[in-house]
Amino acid sequence: MKSALFTRFFILLPWILIVIIMLDVDTRRPVPPLTPRPYFSPYAVGRGGARLPLRRGGPAHGTQKRNQSRPQPQPEPQLPTIYAITPTYSRPVQKAELTRLANTFRQVAQLHWILVEDAAARSELVSRFLARAGLPSTHLHVPTPRRYKRPGLPRATEQRNAGLAWLRQRHQHQRAQPGVLFFADDDNTYSLELFQEMRTTRKVSVWPVGLVGGRRYERPLVENGKVVGWYTGWRADRPFAIDMAGFAVSLQVILSNPKAVFKRRGSQPGMQESDFLKQITTVEELEPKANNCTKVLVWHTRTEKVNLANEPKYHLDTVKIEV
Protein backbone atom coordinates (compact mmCIF):
# COMPACT_ATOMS: atom_id res chain seq x y z
CA MET A 1 0.00 0.00 0.00
CA LYS A 2 2.80 2.39 0.97
CA SER A 3 4.68 1.59 -2.21
CA ALA A 4 1.63 2.54 -4.29
CA LEU A 5 1.32 5.91 -2.50
CA PHE A 6 5.02 6.65 -2.99
CA THR A 7 4.69 5.79 -6.65
CA ARG A 8 1.80 8.24 -7.13
CA PHE A 9 3.61 10.94 -5.12
CA PHE A 10 6.71 10.75 -7.28
CA ILE A 11 4.57 10.83 -10.42
CA LEU A 12 2.77 14.05 -9.31
CA LEU A 13 5.83 15.73 -7.78
CA PRO A 14 7.27 17.17 -11.06
CA TRP A 15 3.93 18.71 -11.99
CA ILE A 16 3.53 20.27 -8.53
CA LEU A 17 6.99 21.84 -8.80
CA ILE A 18 6.20 23.27 -12.25
CA VAL A 19 3.00 24.92 -10.96
CA ILE A 20 4.85 26.42 -7.94
CA ILE A 21 7.59 27.88 -10.18
CA MET A 22 5.06 29.43 -12.59
CA LEU A 23 3.11 31.06 -9.76
CA ASP A 24 6.29 32.47 -8.25
CA VAL A 25 7.45 34.01 -11.57
CA ASP A 26 4.03 35.65 -12.32
CA THR A 27 3.82 37.32 -8.89
CA ARG A 28 7.22 38.97 -9.36
CA ARG A 29 6.19 40.83 -12.59
CA PRO A 30 5.84 44.64 -12.21
CA VAL A 31 2.29 45.87 -12.19
CA PRO A 32 1.57 48.03 -15.31
CA PRO A 33 0.48 51.63 -14.60
CA LEU A 34 -3.25 52.16 -14.70
CA THR A 35 -3.46 54.70 -17.54
CA PRO A 36 -6.63 55.27 -19.57
CA ARG A 37 -6.56 53.79 -23.03
CA PRO A 38 -8.36 55.32 -26.01
CA TYR A 39 -11.70 53.80 -26.78
CA PHE A 40 -12.53 53.42 -30.48
CA SER A 41 -16.19 54.03 -31.04
CA PRO A 42 -17.74 52.56 -34.20
CA TYR A 43 -19.78 55.79 -34.57
CA ALA A 44 -16.84 58.24 -34.52
CA VAL A 45 -15.49 58.43 -38.07
CA GLY A 46 -12.61 60.65 -39.07
CA ARG A 47 -11.19 61.73 -42.43
CA GLY A 48 -10.81 58.94 -44.92
CA GLY A 49 -13.21 56.73 -42.92
CA ALA A 50 -10.73 56.10 -40.05
CA ARG A 51 -12.16 55.65 -36.54
CA LEU A 52 -11.30 58.35 -34.01
CA PRO A 53 -10.51 57.50 -30.36
CA LEU A 54 -12.90 58.84 -27.72
CA ARG A 55 -11.12 59.93 -24.55
CA ARG A 56 -12.30 58.42 -21.27
CA GLY A 57 -12.00 61.86 -19.70
CA GLY A 58 -15.08 63.11 -21.57
CA PRO A 59 -15.91 64.44 -25.07
CA ALA A 60 -14.85 68.00 -24.27
CA HIS A 61 -11.38 66.88 -23.24
CA GLY A 62 -10.92 64.88 -26.45
CA THR A 63 -12.12 67.71 -28.68
CA GLN A 64 -9.77 70.18 -27.03
CA LYS A 65 -6.76 67.94 -27.59
CA ARG A 66 -7.59 67.46 -31.28
CA ASN A 67 -8.08 71.19 -31.89
CA GLN A 68 -4.75 71.99 -30.29
CA SER A 69 -2.80 69.47 -32.33
CA ARG A 70 -4.43 70.12 -35.74
CA PRO A 71 -4.85 73.71 -37.06
CA GLN A 72 -8.12 74.60 -38.73
CA PRO A 73 -7.91 74.65 -42.57
CA GLN A 74 -8.11 78.09 -44.16
CA PRO A 75 -10.85 78.65 -46.79
CA GLU A 76 -9.55 78.79 -50.36
CA PRO A 77 -9.89 82.14 -52.19
CA GLN A 78 -12.87 82.32 -54.52
CA LEU A 79 -12.09 81.86 -58.21
CA PRO A 80 -13.06 85.01 -60.17
CA THR A 81 -15.97 84.44 -62.54
CA ILE A 82 -15.30 85.01 -66.24
CA TYR A 83 -18.24 86.65 -68.04
CA ALA A 84 -18.19 86.12 -71.81
CA ILE A 85 -20.48 88.42 -73.84
CA THR A 86 -21.18 86.94 -77.27
CA PRO A 87 -23.27 88.79 -79.87
CA THR A 88 -24.82 86.44 -82.44
CA TYR A 89 -27.21 86.61 -85.37
CA SER A 90 -29.13 84.15 -87.54
CA ARG A 91 -27.18 82.66 -90.47
CA PRO A 92 -26.44 79.17 -91.86
CA VAL A 93 -23.28 78.71 -89.76
CA GLN A 94 -24.67 80.15 -86.50
CA LYS A 95 -25.18 76.83 -84.71
CA ALA A 96 -21.80 75.52 -85.88
CA GLU A 97 -20.05 78.64 -84.58
CA LEU A 98 -21.83 78.47 -81.22
CA THR A 99 -21.07 74.75 -80.89
CA ARG A 100 -17.34 75.36 -81.27
CA LEU A 101 -17.50 78.15 -78.70
CA ALA A 102 -19.51 76.08 -76.22
CA ASN A 103 -17.06 73.18 -76.47
CA THR A 104 -14.33 75.58 -75.38
CA PHE A 105 -16.29 77.34 -72.63
CA ARG A 106 -17.38 74.02 -71.12
CA GLN A 107 -13.76 73.33 -70.18
CA VAL A 108 -13.33 76.65 -68.33
CA ALA A 109 -14.09 76.75 -64.61
CA GLN A 110 -16.39 79.45 -63.25
CA LEU A 111 -17.49 80.89 -66.62
CA HIS A 112 -20.85 82.53 -67.31
CA TRP A 113 -21.90 82.89 -70.95
CA ILE A 114 -24.02 85.92 -71.90
CA LEU A 115 -25.38 85.21 -75.37
CA VAL A 116 -27.14 88.16 -77.03
CA GLU A 117 -29.14 87.65 -80.22
CA ASP A 118 -29.56 90.38 -82.82
CA ALA A 119 -33.32 89.82 -82.99
CA ALA A 120 -36.64 91.13 -81.72
CA ALA A 121 -37.24 87.85 -79.86
CA ARG A 122 -35.22 84.86 -78.73
CA SER A 123 -35.01 82.21 -81.43
CA GLU A 124 -35.92 78.57 -80.84
CA LEU A 125 -32.61 77.42 -82.29
CA VAL A 126 -30.48 79.37 -79.80
CA SER A 127 -32.84 78.60 -76.90
CA ARG A 128 -32.61 74.85 -77.55
CA PHE A 129 -28.87 75.09 -78.05
CA LEU A 130 -28.27 76.82 -74.71
CA ALA A 131 -30.57 74.40 -72.88
CA ARG A 132 -28.35 71.52 -74.01
CA ALA A 133 -25.00 73.31 -73.76
CA GLY A 134 -24.44 72.45 -70.11
CA LEU A 135 -23.14 75.93 -69.27
CA PRO A 136 -24.18 78.68 -66.85
CA SER A 137 -25.67 81.13 -69.32
CA THR A 138 -27.96 84.08 -69.88
CA HIS A 139 -29.94 84.45 -73.11
CA LEU A 140 -30.69 88.04 -74.17
CA HIS A 141 -31.92 89.64 -77.38
CA VAL A 142 -31.99 93.13 -78.87
CA PRO A 143 -32.40 94.07 -82.54
CA THR A 144 -29.99 96.34 -84.39
CA PRO A 145 -31.88 99.32 -85.87
CA ARG A 146 -32.19 99.04 -89.64
CA ARG A 147 -30.31 102.30 -90.23
CA TYR A 148 -27.21 100.82 -88.57
CA LYS A 149 -27.09 97.68 -90.71
CA ARG A 150 -25.44 99.36 -93.68
CA PRO A 151 -22.01 98.02 -94.76
CA GLY A 152 -19.07 99.76 -93.10
CA LEU A 153 -20.89 100.64 -89.88
CA PRO A 154 -19.90 99.08 -86.53
CA ARG A 155 -21.69 95.83 -85.77
CA ALA A 156 -22.99 94.23 -82.55
CA THR A 157 -23.02 97.55 -80.67
CA GLU A 158 -26.51 97.11 -79.22
CA GLN A 159 -25.82 93.49 -78.29
CA ARG A 160 -22.62 94.24 -76.37
CA ASN A 161 -24.34 97.11 -74.55
CA ALA A 162 -27.20 94.76 -73.60
CA GLY A 163 -24.68 92.39 -72.04
CA LEU A 164 -23.09 95.25 -70.09
CA ALA A 165 -26.50 96.42 -68.87
CA TRP A 166 -27.37 92.91 -67.67
CA LEU A 167 -24.12 92.68 -65.70
CA ARG A 168 -24.67 96.03 -64.01
CA GLN A 169 -28.27 95.22 -63.15
CA ARG A 170 -27.30 91.80 -61.77
CA HIS A 171 -24.78 93.32 -59.35
CA GLN A 172 -26.71 96.52 -58.63
CA HIS A 173 -27.99 95.58 -55.16
CA GLN A 174 -25.33 93.15 -54.02
CA ARG A 175 -21.64 93.19 -53.35
CA ALA A 176 -19.83 92.34 -56.55
CA GLN A 177 -17.83 89.12 -56.44
CA PRO A 178 -14.44 88.93 -58.18
CA GLY A 179 -14.99 88.74 -61.93
CA VAL A 180 -13.61 89.46 -65.38
CA LEU A 181 -15.47 90.42 -68.57
CA PHE A 182 -14.42 89.87 -72.17
CA PHE A 183 -16.17 90.06 -75.52
CA ALA A 184 -16.20 86.65 -77.22
CA ASP A 185 -17.42 86.97 -80.80
CA ASP A 186 -18.80 83.69 -82.13
CA ASP A 187 -16.35 83.56 -85.07
CA ASN A 188 -13.23 83.37 -82.87
CA THR A 189 -11.18 80.38 -81.70
CA TYR A 190 -9.73 80.39 -78.17
CA SER A 191 -6.89 78.59 -76.43
CA LEU A 192 -7.75 77.45 -72.89
CA GLU A 193 -4.55 79.15 -71.73
CA LEU A 194 -6.11 82.53 -72.48
CA PHE A 195 -8.70 82.09 -69.72
CA GLN A 196 -5.98 81.41 -67.16
CA GLU A 197 -4.26 84.60 -68.28
CA MET A 198 -7.29 86.88 -68.17
CA ARG A 199 -8.60 85.62 -64.81
CA THR A 200 -5.93 87.63 -62.94
CA THR A 201 -6.94 90.92 -64.58
CA ARG A 202 -6.82 93.77 -62.07
CA LYS A 203 -8.24 96.50 -64.33
CA VAL A 204 -7.79 96.00 -68.10
CA SER A 205 -5.55 93.31 -69.60
CA VAL A 206 -4.44 92.95 -73.25
CA TRP A 207 -2.88 90.29 -75.50
CA PRO A 208 -2.23 89.53 -79.21
CA VAL A 209 -4.91 88.37 -81.67
CA GLY A 210 -4.17 86.12 -84.63
CA LEU A 211 -5.48 86.37 -88.21
CA VAL A 212 -6.78 89.91 -87.95
CA GLY A 213 -6.21 93.30 -89.60
CA GLY A 214 -4.92 91.75 -92.81
CA ARG A 215 -1.95 90.30 -90.93
CA ARG A 216 -1.00 87.01 -89.32
CA TYR A 217 -1.42 88.74 -85.96
CA GLU A 218 -1.69 92.08 -84.21
CA ARG A 219 -0.33 92.80 -80.76
CA PRO A 220 0.49 95.49 -78.19
CA LEU A 221 4.18 96.44 -78.11
CA VAL A 222 5.59 96.02 -74.60
CA GLU A 223 8.71 97.44 -72.95
CA ASN A 224 9.57 96.86 -69.28
CA GLY A 225 6.13 95.40 -68.66
CA LYS A 226 4.26 98.40 -70.10
CA VAL A 227 2.39 98.87 -73.39
CA VAL A 228 4.22 101.47 -75.48
CA GLY A 229 2.64 101.02 -78.93
CA TRP A 230 0.87 98.73 -81.34
CA TYR A 231 1.87 96.27 -84.05
CA THR A 232 -1.13 96.53 -86.36
CA GLY A 233 -2.04 96.54 -90.01
CA TRP A 234 -4.52 99.40 -89.82
CA ARG A 235 -4.32 102.84 -88.20
CA ALA A 236 -1.65 102.45 -85.55
CA ASP A 237 -2.53 106.00 -84.44
CA ARG A 238 -5.73 104.79 -82.78
CA PRO A 239 -5.72 105.36 -78.98
CA PHE A 240 -6.14 101.60 -78.52
CA ALA A 241 -5.21 99.88 -81.77
CA ILE A 242 -6.56 96.54 -80.63
CA ASP A 243 -9.17 94.01 -81.77
CA MET A 244 -12.32 93.29 -79.76
CA ALA A 245 -10.91 89.85 -78.94
CA GLY A 246 -7.71 91.31 -77.50
CA PHE A 247 -8.69 92.60 -74.06
CA ALA A 248 -10.53 91.82 -70.81
CA VAL A 249 -11.93 94.14 -68.15
CA SER A 250 -12.33 93.63 -64.42
CA LEU A 251 -15.96 93.42 -63.31
CA GLN A 252 -15.29 96.07 -60.68
CA VAL A 253 -14.16 98.49 -63.40
CA ILE A 254 -17.39 97.88 -65.34
CA LEU A 255 -19.49 98.53 -62.23
CA SER A 256 -17.45 101.60 -61.26
CA ASN A 257 -18.03 103.16 -64.70
CA PRO A 258 -21.79 102.76 -65.28
CA LYS A 259 -21.81 105.09 -68.30
CA ALA A 260 -19.09 103.23 -70.19
CA VAL A 261 -20.78 101.75 -73.28
CA PHE A 262 -20.17 101.23 -76.99
CA LYS A 263 -21.27 104.34 -78.84
CA ARG A 264 -23.07 104.75 -82.15
CA ARG A 265 -23.03 108.50 -82.50
CA GLY A 266 -19.63 109.97 -83.27
CA SER A 267 -17.94 106.59 -83.51
CA GLN A 268 -16.05 105.82 -86.70
CA PRO A 269 -15.66 102.33 -88.22
CA GLY A 270 -12.89 100.42 -86.48
CA MET A 271 -12.92 102.73 -83.46
CA GLN A 272 -15.37 100.83 -81.23
CA GLU A 273 -12.62 99.34 -79.08
CA SER A 274 -10.83 102.67 -78.62
CA ASP A 275 -14.02 104.57 -77.87
CA PHE A 276 -14.95 102.06 -75.18
CA LEU A 277 -11.54 101.66 -73.54
CA LYS A 278 -10.97 105.44 -73.38
CA GLN A 279 -13.86 105.60 -70.91
CA ILE A 280 -12.34 103.19 -68.39
CA THR A 281 -8.52 103.19 -68.64
CA THR A 282 -5.35 104.60 -70.17
CA VAL A 283 -2.61 102.95 -72.21
CA GLU A 284 -0.21 103.27 -69.26
CA GLU A 285 -2.56 101.22 -67.06
CA LEU A 286 -2.91 98.27 -69.46
CA GLU A 287 -1.75 94.87 -68.16
CA PRO A 288 0.14 92.84 -70.79
CA LYS A 289 -0.69 89.12 -70.75
CA ALA A 290 0.45 86.14 -72.83
CA ASN A 291 4.15 86.42 -72.00
CA ASN A 292 4.34 90.19 -72.50
CA CYS A 293 2.09 89.96 -75.57
CA THR A 294 4.34 87.54 -77.46
CA LYS A 295 1.95 84.54 -77.61
CA VAL A 296 -1.18 84.26 -79.75
CA LEU A 297 -3.98 82.59 -77.75
CA VAL A 298 -7.02 83.73 -79.76
CA TRP A 299 -7.65 83.71 -83.51
CA HIS A 300 -10.24 85.54 -85.58
CA THR A 301 -10.84 82.44 -87.69
CA ARG A 302 -14.18 83.28 -89.34
CA THR A 303 -16.06 80.37 -90.84
CA GLU A 304 -15.84 80.20 -94.62
CA LYS A 305 -18.87 81.56 -96.43
CA VAL A 306 -21.18 78.64 -97.07
CA ASN A 307 -21.99 77.60 -100.63
CA LEU A 308 -25.73 76.86 -100.79
CA ALA A 309 -26.13 77.14 -104.56
CA ASN A 310 -27.84 73.74 -104.75
CA GLU A 311 -30.19 74.28 -101.84
CA PRO A 312 -33.81 73.98 -103.12
CA LYS A 313 -36.03 77.02 -102.85
CA TYR A 314 -38.72 75.01 -101.12
CA HIS A 315 -38.15 72.30 -98.51
CA LEU A 316 -38.22 68.96 -100.33
CA ASP A 317 -36.95 66.56 -97.66
CA THR A 318 -39.46 64.45 -95.78
CA VAL A 319 -37.99 65.47 -92.42
CA LYS A 320 -37.04 68.86 -91.02
CA ILE A 321 -33.46 68.96 -89.75
CA GLU A 322 -31.93 71.76 -87.72
CA VAL A 323 -28.46 72.74 -88.93
Swiss-Prot record:
Domain of life of the organism encoding this protein: Eukaryota
Active site, UniProt feature: E273
Gene3D superfamilies in the record: Spore Coat Polysaccharide Biosynthesis Protein SpsA, Chain A (3.90.550.10)
Membrane topology, record value: Single-pass type II membrane protein
Residues bound to Mn(2+): D187
Binding of UDP-alpha-D-glucuronate, residues: P87, T88, Y89, D118, R155, R160, D185, D186, D187, H300, T301, R302
Glycosylation sites: N67, N292
Cytoplasmic compartment segments: 1-2
Compartment annotation: Golgi apparatus membrane
Tissue-by-tissue expression: Expressed in the trachea, retina, spinal cord, hippocampus and other brain regions, and, at lower levels, in testis and ovary.
Topological domain spans for side Lumenal: 24-323
UniProt GO MF annotations: galactosylgalactosylxylosylprotein 3-beta-glucuronosyltransferase activity; metal ion binding
Catalytic activity: 3-O-(beta-D-galactosyl-(1->3)-beta-D-galactosyl-(1->4)-beta-D-xylosyl)-L-seryl-[protein] + UDP-alpha-D-glucuronate = 3-O-(beta-D-GlcA-(1->3)-beta-D-Gal-(1->3)-beta-D-Gal-(1->4)-beta-D-Xyl)-L-seryl-[protein] + UDP + H(+)
EC identifiers of the protein: 2.4.1.135
Cofactor(s) listed in the protein's UniProt record: Mn(2+)
Region spans: Disordered: 51-80
Record keywords: Glycoprotein, Golgi apparatus, Manganese, Membrane, Metal-binding, Signal-anchor, Transferase, Transmembrane, Transmembrane helix
Site (Interaction with galactose moiety of substrate glycoprotein): E218, N310
Record-annotated membrane-spanning stretches: 3-23
Interaction with galactose moiety of substrate glycoprotein as annotated region, ranges: 234-243
Enzyme class: transferase
Annotated function: Involved in the biosynthesis of L2/HNK-1 carbohydrate epitope on both glycolipids and glycoproteins.
Membership in a protein family: Belongs to the glycosyltransferase 43 family.
Known partners and oligomeric status: Homodimer.
Protein's name in the database: Galactosylgalactosylxylosylprotein 3-beta-glucuronosyltransferase 2
Organism: Homo sapiens (Human)
Taxonomic path: Eukaryota, Metazoa, Chordata, Craniata, Vertebrata
Gene this chain is encoded by: B3GAT2
